[in-house]
Amino acid sequence: MMMAVLNISLAFIFSLLGTLMFRSHLMSTLLCLEGMMLTLFIITTITSLNSHSMVMYPIPIVILVFAACEAAVGLALLVKVSNTYGSDYVQNLNLLQC
């Protein structure tokens, strides 16, 4: 059990590092965010099953709802940016450029 939690935590850390390293493309950032949400869902599911508390059972469902909303908004933003600028480079979105 402890090894599974360690692997899931490492997956979250690698997704976070991927978000920080591959931030030039919006699609890769969205994929890393989805990986982070998936690991959060798995961790909260394991925690709620181990705690045997009725209060903890809806928390994984709430995280799934947030993940679905994040995916929908992210894909809508990706479509809008690619239609407007022709690519998914994040540098095009910087408003501080002269």
Curated annotation (Swiss-Prot):
Any one GO cellular component localisation term in the record: respiratory chain complex I
UniProt KW keywords: Electron transport, Membrane, Mitochondrion, Mitochondrion inner membrane, NAD, Respiratory chain, Translocase, Transmembrane, Transmembrane helix, Transport, Ubiquinone
Bilayer topology: Multi-pass membrane protein
Signal peptide interval: none
Molecular function (Gene Ontology), one example: NADH dehydrogenase (ubiquinone) activity
Catalyzed chemical reaction(s): a ubiquinone + NADH + 5 H(+)(in) = a ubiquinol + NAD(+) + 4 H(+)(out)
Location in the cell: Mitochondrion inner membrane
InterPro entries (UniProt xref): NADH_UbQ_OxRdtase_chain4L/K, NUOK/Mnh_C1-like
Family: Belongs to the complex I subunit 4L family.
Biological role: Core subunit of the mitochondrial membrane respiratory chain NADH dehydrogenase (Complex I) which catalyzes electron transfer from NADH through the respiratory chain, using ubiquinone as an electron acceptor. Part of the enzyme membrane arm which is embedded in the lipid bilayer and involved in proton translocation.
Subunit structure: Core subunit of respiratory chain NADH dehydrogenase (Complex I) which is composed of 45 different subunits.
Stated name of the protein: NADH-ubiquinone oxidoreductase chain 4L
Organism whose genome encodes this protein: Phodopus sungorus
Taxonomy of the source species: Eukaryota, Metazoa, Chordata, Craniata, Vertebrata
Recorded name of the encoding gene: MT-ND4L
